[in-house]
C-alpha cells in the first residue's frame, strides 16, 4: 500500500466556526441555545460542561460569528464590552465578581450579550454582592454532555482530514468502542496515529489503532 502524504498539524486551522462544529445529540440543545442570540433572557447565557466536551469551540464560534469581544475573566475590559456581545470563558475559575456584575448589566442593553463558559452552574458561584447573587441564581444555562458517537466520529474524521489521513472505515467504529469520551482524547489519538505511521512508514489501520490505544491506556475491553 502506498504511504499517504501527511501534514503535521498540532493545532486546528483558522478560527473556530459553526460550520466546523460537529453537532450531535450531546450538544444539540447547546448549539440551538447559542444560535438563538440575541433572544437570550437578559442577553445572557452560560454553556456548562466538563473539560473536553466542546464548550470553548462552540463559544468561540459564536464570538467569531457575531464579532464578540473576548474578555479576561479576572480583569474584563468594560469599555470594550459596552454595546458589544461579549465572551467570557472559564467564568467559574477566578472571575472578577464586580466585573461580572457590570458585564451582566451591559448584556441587557442594545447590541449587548454575554456568553459564559463554565464547569459549574452560576447559582453555585461564591459572591458577597447581593445583587450579583440574585443575577447568578437566575442566570440562563445550557449544558453540553460528554460527546456521543456522532460527535466523536465527526471530530475524528475532521482531525484525520486536517492531517490528510484517510484510514479504513473500520478504524472509526473500533476507536469509538474503546476510546475515552473526550474531544482532546480524540485529537491526541489522531496525532499519535499520525506520528506512529510516520515513524514506522505504516498506514493508519485497525492494528495500529489498537497499539496506540494500548500504549495510551485508552483501551476499554
Task: Label the predicted regions.
Residues 139, 153-166:
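Conserved AAA+ ATPase "sensor/coupling" helix adjacent to the nucleotide-binding pocket
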Residues 139-151:
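Conserved AAA+ ATPase "SRH/arginine-finger" region at the nucleotide-binding site
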Residues 42-58:
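Walker A/P-loop nucleotide-binding motif
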Residues 1-36, 198-221:
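A short, basic N-terminal segment
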Residues 72-106, 110-120:
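Conserved P-loop NTPase "ATPase switch" module shared by AAA+ and STAND
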Residues 122-137:
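Short regulatory helix/loop adjacent to the ATP-binding pocket of P-loop NTPases
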Amino acid at each position: 500500500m502506498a504511504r499517504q502524504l501527511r501534514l503535521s498539524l498540532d493545532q486546528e486551522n483558522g478560527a473556530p466556526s459553526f460550520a466546523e462544529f460537529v453537532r450531535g445529540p450531546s450538544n444539540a440543545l447547546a448549539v440551538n441555545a447559542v444560535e438563538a442570540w440575541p433572544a437570550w433572557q437578559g442577553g445572557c447565557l452560560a454553556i456548562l460542561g466538563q473539560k473536553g466536551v466542546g464548550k470553548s469551540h462552540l463559544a468561540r464560534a459564536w464570538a467569531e460569528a457575531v464579532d464578540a469581544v473576548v474578555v479576561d475573566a479576572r480583569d474584563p475590559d468594560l469599555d470594550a464590552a459596552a454595546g458589544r456581545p461579549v465572551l467570557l470563558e472559564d467564568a467559574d475559575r477566578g472571575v472578577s465578581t464586580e466585573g461580572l456584575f457590570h458585564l451582566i448589566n451591559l448584556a441587557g442593553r442594545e447590541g449587548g450579550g454575554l456568553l459564559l463558559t463554565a464547569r459549574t452552574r452560576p447559582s453555585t458561584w461564591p459572591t458577597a454582592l447581593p445583587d450579583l447573587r440574585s443575577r447568578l441564581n437566575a442566570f440562563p444555562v445550557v449544558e453540553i454532555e460528554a460527546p456521543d458517537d456522532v460527535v466523536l466520529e465527526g471530530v475524528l474524521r475532521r482531525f484525520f482530514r486536517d492531517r490528510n489521513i484517510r484510514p479504513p472505515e473500520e478504524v472509526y467504529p473500533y476507536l469509538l468502542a474503546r476510546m475515552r469520551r473526550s474531544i482532546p482524547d480524540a485529537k491526541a489519538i489522531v496525532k499519535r496515529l499520525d506520528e506512529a505511521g510516520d515513524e514506522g512508514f505504516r498506514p493508519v489501520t485497525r492494528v495500529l489503532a489498537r497499539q496506540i490505544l494500548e500504549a495510551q491506556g485508552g483501551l476499554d475491553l
